[in-house]
């Protein structure tokens, strides 16, 4: 609730040094005169070279005041009444500009107070009494003061639970130091005062709230063109209570630096609306395109973009942060079908509130108009991702849904990889989930079946991959029969009923009745003979009973079915115990690995079915008889048998050394043209057993 950005305190250095010019000169144009030769803002070098018009330069104090007040304006525009900003001016003492009270948390109060403070005087003699340390001490004391929200929380919790109130804050100090040593001294003093303040806030004194953590940001500003001896430093943890970061920036660029910092301090994002058509100020008959930069919550972009969209970003001249570029969309009439759902709305404030393009855009929105913003996709097309509109005198950015909406129809499961599959057993899967629901018990029941027994044993995902579950829609007694097979507490009466149903299947097979298939979903169930259909049915039924055979009644059913299969001429082969469990519980005799679509015609359907059945039975029976080591060893032996072994190993007795080149060096020396003697080079290799 009480985050670190809820309390922010600006400490402004009001010493004599801040009365000097920032060295960024601005030309003055008069209505009846001509503009200066420089034609705008120039630097110190341009001023030295001379110019035809009048120029002036802001002081360091003016640059610091304008940028800090603009910082708090953005905070109060985007978080009205939720985030608090205070100002403290430091010279010979600390001057409190405003408090945590809502009556002083507004632009009018702060600006009137800053006018009364004024620019530091250059005629004041240099003295050690003028220091920014006075303001830093007052800032720590201000952090210990509770806000109205903290007071309300303390009233709810009671006085005995005050340490439970979180109290964090941030101090932004705008000053100017000589070197890193002076900056290090400033950090040490701040850390010491922070520890002392927490000691005063602890019992029994209880003077204010304990400061849990403080983030100190020091901005070391210098005139334009002046190099500073203070080194920039990223966020560094000084103590468990204090984090410090240091930035050295020229006075004209301090506004860009504070805008960059506020993005991280309050989790904001910058958006630049480009190509805004606007009439020229001096020529009403022509128009030009302008850009306006706005600030808002970062979530306005994060909740809109999906994986198929990218945010186009750019960096403004003079700035160091990125801004998202969105294009002005020309208003056009659209029906309800063209409107996207809104994912969220967030307050908006312009970066430069006094510029003419910002003023025109604000007035356009406050008059009841809305603006759609476009963003390009990766493919090059554009999508309307945001909308600007105003309500109640406040401007909002609406994040529009550019991906699939929750109100859209869900994508069909048949559109996934692997082609269209339309016979998923969705309803049966839901019933299975309800039946398999487990609840924790305080006391373990010793008579309860083990956990693995209650898990689903066999569940084909599609109807076309199973004969047994495909027929339950057409044979009336089959659903009840399947329910009895998976019962955990099957009794003798259930066993008798199942025996009767199994004998009915045997009688139907003896009469040659064709199983009632109405929907085959391809060619998987297109078997030319009823005998092949019953064989597959018996095999799947045996697999189902075998996976659930935990009671004596299940085992009796399994033996009865196996005897019927033997009488039918389809006796199962003996296999190792548990070998069938190596197959997936979602596979069936009609899975693609077991039975492929028959494309050879009806004449060869019977032979192909028989061969597939035999191959499937061989795979199921041989599964588990060979280990992975046996398979790899067999492959290595088959490869080694294709090559002849080294003759030295074959001809040399075990334990002796074989010569690698036995005939090398035995040729007549006369045959050598050079007549030089050849030294035999004999290499030996030991024979490994």
UniProtKB/Swiss-Prot annotation:
Post-translation changes: Phosphorylated.
One Pfam family cited in the UniProt record for this chain: Mat89Bb
Coiled coil: 521-550
Protein name: Protein asunder
Keyword Cytoplasm among UniProt keywords: yes
UniProt key word Transferase: no
Record-level GO cellular component terms: cytoplasm; INTAC complex; integrator complex; nucleus; perinuclear region of cytoplasm
Compartmental location: Nucleus; Cytoplasm; Cytoplasm, Perinuclear region
GO biological process, one term: spermatogenesis
Regions of compositional bias (Low complexity) in chain numbering: 599-614
Region (Disordered): 578-619, 662-689
């Amino acid at each position: 609730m009480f985050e670190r950005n809820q309390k922010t305190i600006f400490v402004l250095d009001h010493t004599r040094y801040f009365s000097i010019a920032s060295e960024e000169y601005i030309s003055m144009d008069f209505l009846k005169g001509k503009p200066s030769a420089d034609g705008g803002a120039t630097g110190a070098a341009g001023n030295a070279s001379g110019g035809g018009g009048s120029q002036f330069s802001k002081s360091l104090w003016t640059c610091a005041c304008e940028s800090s007040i603009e910082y708090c304006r953005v905070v109060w525009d985007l978080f009205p009444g939720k985030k608090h900003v205070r100002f403290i001016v430091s010279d010979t003492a600390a001057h409190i500009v405003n408090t945590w009270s809502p009556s002083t948390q507004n632009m009018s109060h702060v600006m009137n107070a800053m006018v009364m403070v004024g620019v530091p005087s250059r005629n004041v003699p240099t003295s050690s009494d003028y220091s920014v340390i006075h303001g830093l001490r007052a800032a720590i004391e201000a952090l210990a003061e509770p806000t109205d929200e903290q007071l309300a929380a303390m009233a709810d919790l009671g006085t005995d639970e005050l340490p439970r109130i979180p109290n964090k804050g941030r101090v932004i100090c705008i000053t100017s130091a000589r070197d890193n040593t002076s900056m290090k001294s400033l950090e040490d003093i701040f850390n010491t005062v922070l520890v002392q303040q927490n000691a005063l806030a602890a019992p029994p004194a209880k003077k204010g709230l304990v400061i849990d953590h403080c983030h100190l940001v020091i901005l070391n500003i210098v005139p334009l063109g002046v190099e500073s001896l203070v080194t920039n430093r990223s966020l560094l943890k000084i103590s468990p209570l204090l984090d410090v970061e240091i930035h050295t920036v020229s006075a004209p660029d301090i506004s860009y630096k504070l805008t960059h910092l506020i993005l991280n301090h309050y989790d904001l994002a910058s958006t630049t609306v480009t190509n805004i058509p606007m009439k020229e100020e001096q020529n009403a008959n022509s128009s030009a395109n302008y850009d306006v930069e706005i600030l808002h919550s970062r979530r306005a972009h994060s909740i809109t973009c999906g994986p198929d969209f990218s945010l186009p970003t750019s960096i403004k001249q003079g700035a160091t942060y990125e801004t998202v570029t969105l294009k002005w969309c020309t208003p056009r009439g659209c029906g309800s079908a063209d409107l996207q759902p809104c994912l969220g709305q967030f307050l908006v404030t312009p970066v430069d509130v006094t510029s003419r393009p910002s003023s025109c855009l604000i007035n356009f929105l406050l008059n009841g108009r809305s603006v759609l913003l476009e963003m390009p996709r990766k493919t090059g097309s554009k999508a309307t991702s945001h909308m600007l509109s105003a309500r109640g005198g406040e401007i909002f950015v609406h994040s529009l849904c550019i991906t699939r909406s929750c109100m859209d129809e869900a994508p069909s499961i048949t559109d996934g990889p692997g082609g269209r599959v339309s016979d998923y057993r969705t309803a049966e899967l839901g019933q299975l989930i309800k039946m398999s629901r487990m609840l924790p018990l305080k006391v373990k029941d010793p008579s309860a079946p083990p956990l693995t027994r209650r898990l689903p044993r066999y569940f084909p995902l599609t109807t076309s991959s199973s004969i047994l579950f495909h027929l339950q829609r057409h044979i009336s007694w089959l659903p009840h029969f399947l329910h009895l097979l998976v019962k955990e507490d099957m009794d003798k009466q259930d066993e008798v009923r199942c025996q009767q149903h199994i004998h009915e299947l045997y009688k139907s097979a003896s009469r040659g009745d064709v199983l009632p298939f109405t929907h085959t979903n391809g060619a998987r169930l297109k078997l030319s003979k009823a005998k092949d259909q019953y064989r597959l049915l018996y095999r799947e039924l045996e697999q189902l009973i075998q996976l659930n055979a935990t009671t004596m009644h299940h085992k009796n059913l399994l033996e009865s079915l196996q005897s019927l299969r033997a009488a039918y001429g389809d006796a199962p082969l003996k296999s190792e115990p548990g070998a069938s469990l190596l197959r997936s519980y979602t596979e069936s005799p009609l899975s693609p690995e077991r039975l492929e679509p028959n494309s050879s015609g009806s004449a060869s359907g019977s032979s192909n079915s028989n061969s597939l059945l035999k191959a499937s039975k061989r795979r199921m029976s041989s599964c588990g008889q060979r280990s992975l080591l046996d398979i790899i060893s067999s492959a290595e032996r088959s490869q080694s048998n294709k090559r002849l072994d080294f003759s030295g190993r074959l001809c040399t007795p075990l334990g002796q050394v074989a010569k690698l080149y036995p005939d090398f060096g035995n040729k007549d020396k006369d045959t050598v043209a050079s007549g030089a003697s050849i030294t035999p080079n004999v290499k030996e290799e030991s024979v490994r057993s």
